[in-house]
């Protein structure tokens, strides 16, 4: 009962994707509760943090590159309603990118994406490095196979670009 109340309160306090200032780095860094018999998705990277700036040659564009892993750990699948990436800038501004269908590039005809129990997905992320960006927050929302609304987040900090 307490876990369900905490989840309901947490979902009620989610930032609105339409509000530009609703997301914070701290919000993306919060750990989600691992509730028994409910989907639990871990979103992470194996890259050293902060993600380093890479530049192949002096003439090439500097980038931040990392793989984002999304793994369900409780054996309960999730129908994904939204995968959102928020890029944070030193100025406090954000850019918000959200996908609601085919979020993993499955080309499934516009139907919602699905992550099965104990399944892992990987996204390759490459961003042009600049002096203003400080990192990206990732959020996955959906409904698990038991009808529970779920939301999971992570924050990926970027190495400071000094060119």
PLM region spans:
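Short, solvent-exposed loop/turn segments enriched in Ser/Thr/Gly
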Residues: 47, 58-67, 135-136
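Short, hydrophobic/aromatic beta-strand segments
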Residues: 76-84
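Short beta-strand elements
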Residues: 150-163
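Bacterial Sec-dependent signal peptides at the C-terminal "C-region" and cleavage site
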Residues: 9-24
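A eukaryote-biased signal for short, well-structured alpha-helical docking elements
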Residues: 20-38
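Asparagine-centered strand-capping/turn motif at beta-strand->loop junctions
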Residues: 70-74
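Surface-exposed binding patches on compact interaction domains or structured appendages
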Residues: 89-111
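Short, solvent-exposed, Trp/other aromatic-anchored flexible loops in extracytoplasmic proteins
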Residues: 103-139, 144
């Amino acid at each position: 009962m307490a876990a369900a109340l905490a989840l309901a309160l947490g979902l009620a306090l989610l930032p609105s994707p339409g509000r530009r200032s609703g997301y914070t780095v701290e919000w993306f860094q919060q750990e989600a509760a691992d509730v028994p018999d409910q989907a639990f998705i871990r979103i992470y990277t194996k890259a050293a943090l902060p993600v380093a700036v890479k530049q192949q040659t002096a003439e090439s564009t500097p980038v931040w590159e990392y793989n984002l892993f999304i793994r369900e750990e409780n054996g309960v699948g999730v129908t994904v309603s939204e995968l959102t990436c928020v890029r944070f800038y030193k100025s406090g501004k954000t850019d918000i990118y959200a996908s609601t269908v085919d979020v993993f590039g499955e080309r499934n005809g516009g139907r919602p994406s699905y992550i099965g129990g104990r399944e892992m997905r990987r996204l390759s992320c490459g961003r042009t490095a600049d002096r203003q960006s400080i990192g990206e927050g990732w959020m996955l929302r959906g409904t698990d196979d038991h009808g529970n609304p779920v939301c999971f987040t992570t924050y990926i900090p970027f190495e400071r670009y000094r060119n």
